[in-house]
Amino acid sequence: MGIYEYTVNRINQLCEERKITPNALSYIAGVSQSTIKSILNGESKNPGVVTLKKICDGLDITMMEFFDTEEYRKLEQEIQ
């Protein structure tokens, strides 16, 4: 798994945990529906830091919490 796949999986996981749809996330985060859709559908494989920060804010987590998972730690080891 690469960073892009991790990001998509993490957004989907957090939406499921909060019982919100990607469309609801776009509204809460102040990000367009097309931006969320393009990230989740693979059209945008490199969401910017500002976009990711808005998504995290909408999910009521920090960016540290977004990346603080076992999957990310494994990914980090693979990259090194």
Regions found by a protein language model. Give the residues of each.
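Intrinsically disordered, low-complexity basic tails/linkers immediately adjacent to helix-turn-helix/homeobox/MYB/SANT
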Residues: 57-65
